[in-house]
């Protein structure tokens, strides 16, 4: 086991990720150069904590090892959890989604959910993204000064996910708040008054499950044009989702489909503001440049910082002996800055090709199911912004989420010249 004096604070602590970006980048480069596969200790848990004490985890910081682990799910399993700290058993009922499963369970759920995305459903999604983006700009265009994350970046994926699942608008704020609690665990802004983080996360899962059960019950036997209706009424080779499957899938959509797109859009405005030459290249030929620009935003933003796997057998990775049962964490954000893969990796380049990033996860069965939708949302949102608020820019520094799992932006001030609403 490699034993090298690593940077401080520990990479698995949220304190590592709320520092100046230059400090984070310097330390990630240190890991890639000096200890690309290295073991770090987990924090000591209080004796009364329901979280089991873990020995530690292997950190993968280079692109090559992350691809190798992603392509070998039979050796690097998702079923024991996807975060560094193990969850209390009672959490599994709400958070044991397909992302934390191996085949054949993972393949079964993914197959059923994929079947729900019919051509008609996909067309509805395309139309919905355009309409929602236009409505969002209408809601802010006369203000001239906004919190870009709250008013724009978060509003789009939240509305799309809720519409997709048939969730009534009356629940939108509740869904948004629960998402913040689950993924912002530990950030002071989202801490409950009593400081009990685990209870807050558990209760957020309970609320989301209740919302989904209510929606699913209302869709039984109906012919509504949403994914929940398709999933509760359709059977695929005598197989269908249970209510627990449906609830955990909804939670996955809320936290993955909502938060990751929100953070990509939020970081995207920051990158475009800091790199006006790249912004102009995109504006000059939006449709042609959009595919590479969106991939570059996702690469640098890396909305999901890492994913954990667990070794199912003794193995060798990056020259290190990994034992059966060891945790292995793939730090996507570091891999997306790997100097061996990306030329000038810290440069924001909207024309970057090739761009073999792992911002949607590595290759293999767990590649992001919603990658196509996320790309579409990012493209449409920036098209609408460039067209109607052409001088919009970040007017301050992002307020970064204090979390190690999500590379999040909580708030980002933005300014633009006010314009009138569209008459539609």
Please tell me what each predicted stretch does.
Residues 1-424:
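Cytochrome P450
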């Amino acid at each position: 086991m490699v034993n090298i004096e690593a940077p401080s604070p520990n990479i698995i602590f949220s304190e590592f990720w709320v520092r100046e970006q230059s400090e984070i980048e310097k330390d990630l480069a240190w890991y890639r150069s000096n200890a690309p596969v290295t073991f770090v200790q987990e924090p000591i848990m209080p004796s009364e904590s329901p979280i089991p004490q873990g020995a530690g985890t292997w950190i993968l910081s280079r692109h090559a090892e992350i691809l190798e682990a992603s392509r070998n799910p039979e050796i690097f399993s998702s079923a024991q959890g996807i975060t560094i700290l193990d969850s209390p058993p009672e959490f599994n009922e709400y958070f044991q989604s397909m992302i934390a499963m191996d085949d054949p369970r993972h393949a079964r759920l993914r197959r059923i959910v994929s079947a729900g995305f019919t051509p008609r459903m996909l067309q509805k999604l395309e139309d919905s993204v355009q309409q929602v983006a236009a409505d969002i700009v209408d809601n802010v265009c006369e203000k001239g000064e906004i919190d870009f994350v709250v008013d724009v970046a978060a509003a789009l994926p939240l509305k799309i996910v809720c519409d997709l699942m048939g969730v009534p608008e009356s629940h939108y704020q509740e869904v948004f708040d629960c998402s913040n609690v689950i993924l912002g665990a530990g950030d002071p802004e989202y801490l409950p008054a009593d400081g009990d983080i685990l209870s807050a996360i558990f209760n957020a899962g309970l609320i989301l499950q209740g919302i989904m059960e209510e929606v699913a019950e209302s869709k039984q036997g109906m012919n509504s044009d949403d994914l929940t209706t398709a999933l509760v009424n359709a059977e695929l080779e005598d197989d269908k989702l249970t209510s627990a499957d449906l609830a955990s899938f909804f939670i996955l959509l809320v936290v993955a489909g909502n938060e990751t797109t929100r953070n990509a859009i939020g970081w995207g405005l920051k990158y475009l503001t800091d790199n006006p030459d790249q912004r102009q290249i995109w504006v000059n030929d939006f449709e042609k440049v959009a595919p590479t620009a969106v991939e570059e935003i996702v690469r640098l933003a890396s909305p999901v910082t890492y994913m954990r796997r667990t070794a199912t057998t003794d193995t060798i990775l990056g020259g290190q002996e990994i034992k059966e049962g060891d945790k292995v964490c793939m730090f996507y954000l570091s891999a997306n800055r790997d100097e061996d893969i990306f030329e000038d990796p810290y440069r924001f380049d909207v024309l970057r090709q090739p761009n073999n990033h792992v911002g949607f996860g590595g290759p293999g069965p767990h590649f992001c199911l919603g990658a196509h939708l996320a790309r579409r949302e990012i493209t449409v949102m920036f098209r609408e912004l460039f067209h109607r608020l052409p001088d919009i820019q970040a007017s301050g520094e992002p307020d970064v989420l204090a979390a190690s799992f999500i590379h999040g932006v909580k708030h980002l001030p933005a300014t633009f010249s006010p314009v009138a609403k569209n008459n539609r």
